[in-house]
Amino acid sequence: RLISAAENHPEVYAKVSDEIEKKAAANKAPVLGITGTGGSGKSSMVDELIRRFLIDQPDKTIGVISVDPSKRKTGGALLGDRIRMNSIRGERIYMRSLATRQSNLALSKHVQKAVDILKAAGFDLIVLETSGIGQSDTEILDHSDVSLYIMTPEFGAATQLEKIDMLDFADVVAV
């Protein structure tokens, strides 16, 4: 409900934002930012990471924020990332989809508030998945401690790799 308040009712969220920010600052949970081109397998990778995390860390919790693009023509968003995620059920996981609410963006303008809310709630790991990005988008770096760039092997000519900014900044690249 707090994430919805941050998105839709800023006046309500403003009443609790200071407390949330204090609690979020006290939680040193890492934020894993996952980004890549549309259709590269970001949601499938998130699902696999969640599955392994839940097995390997039986006492830990994970919060997932998944951002999907809003269509320019209709303003709507499919929020379909969860279709690929089979491991998002259970008491130790929370998954929330957000729409970019604008075209040509990889993240929602409310994503940092959502991350802070999950940190304040005490999650041990937070995964932030962007919608598909273009060659010059590195916005995920502003919201994550560790960044993972996912790409397909069909990237075109080798010179295309030189144009992908995330290859210069990502902590991990998965093909």
Regions inferred by a protein language model and the residue ranges of each:
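Short, conserved "post-DEAD/DEAH" coupling segment immediately C-terminal to helicase motif II
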Residues: T138-E139, E162-D165
